[in-house]
Amino acid sequence: MSTAFLTLIAVIVCILFRILNVHSQPLKPSVWCLDAHFLDCLYKIAPVLREPYIPPRLWGFSGHVQTVLHSIVGRVRCPWPLGERVYMSLKDGSTLTYDLYQPLNEQEDDITVAICPGIANSSESVYIRTFVHLAQCNGYRCAVLNHIGALRSVQVTSTRIFTYGHTEDFAAMVEHLHQKYRQSRIVAVGFSLGGNLVTKYMGEDQKTKPDKVIGGISICQGYNAVEGTKWLLNWQNFRRFYLYIMTENVKSIILRHRHILLSDEVKARHNLNEREIIAAATLPELDEAYTRRVYNFPSTQELYKWSSSLFYFDTIKKPMIFINAKDDPLIPEDLLHPIKEYATTRQNTAYVEVAHGGHLGFYEGGFLYPNPVTWLDRTLVAMVGSLVMMHEVGKVAP
């Protein structure tokens, strides 16, 4: 066997070891929290936060592998919870749907978990189904917002789809749930884009929210779209590749409903160029060609600033828990500094940072094969319980 061949094998092995990050060890999550009472309640109901997160040994310490597996596989042996689809007609002519799942086990408290999925996702997304099933088994009712345009089986009936910052659809679902279950307390849970929407919704003081909304949980959001898009346009850490995938997902929804979203009347009204929309290779290009025009923003920078939850932190009145992974390839550490500062200066707020997990991955398991339920699923269910307990015992600071 030649020296050159052996050298090549050695280089490949070194690259694989570096990508898989196999030298890493399981670590306990880091928690930023000013409020001692809040933190005590969180640890009491979610003791998993005191324990090391142990991903699959071979590949689980790589944020890239976790992220790619999440986007391709989602979860293993995923259940398909049985629920009902609720249809709502909004004032702008949009057809909004959400899927409603009743608890499988009785609990003393009537709790509804209002779930906002990630970009272009819905109740049919595998990671959402896994979390819903686990929450049902723990006695929680779940409602999952289907982002307008995301479901192939539901036609778009107005000239818009979801965006990164418009919270009206989520607010409409929460209000409908409140009218339907008057005594139920509501915990809002958002994943990625949904985390931004939930946080922004909680901080929009000009919008009236039901008093039964007792808190929110945000997972894997970037907080600041203005700065976040700059990072995503960089090829470092393969971010430009991830941005391309997200762009194609949103673009495919627009083109799937082009007979309404890109009708001649709509294109004339908003000065849309269909060729520019089709040619867009990044979200900023797509938002310049489509989103900011449909919503009448003077620039994408204005759209991104208005959409970013970071600028609504100071007006959040209810308890919030934020979760991010340090190795999330979509969200660099620089974007996490503001949430750390916020959590250490505000009551009723906690920020949990996990060393590994990627973007919405957080798989657990042995050497190779992951468990059906992830660390994130288990932790979120416990966090919902901690918010409920804090509300009940009156430890939420005024």
UniProtKB/Swiss-Prot annotation:
Enzyme class: hydrolase
Keywords for this protein: Hydrolase, Membrane, Serine esterase, Signal-anchor, Transmembrane, Transmembrane helix
Cellular compartments annotated: Membrane
InterPro entries, per the entry: AB_hydrolase_1, AB_hydrolase_4_CS, AB_hydrolase_4_sf, AB_hydrolase_fold, ABHD4
Disulphide-bridged cysteine pairs: none
Parts of the chain that traverse the membrane: 5-22
Active site: S192, D328, H359
Family recorded in the similarity comment: Belongs to the AB hydrolase superfamily. AB hydrolase 4 family.
Name assigned to this protein: Abhydrolase domain-containing protein 2
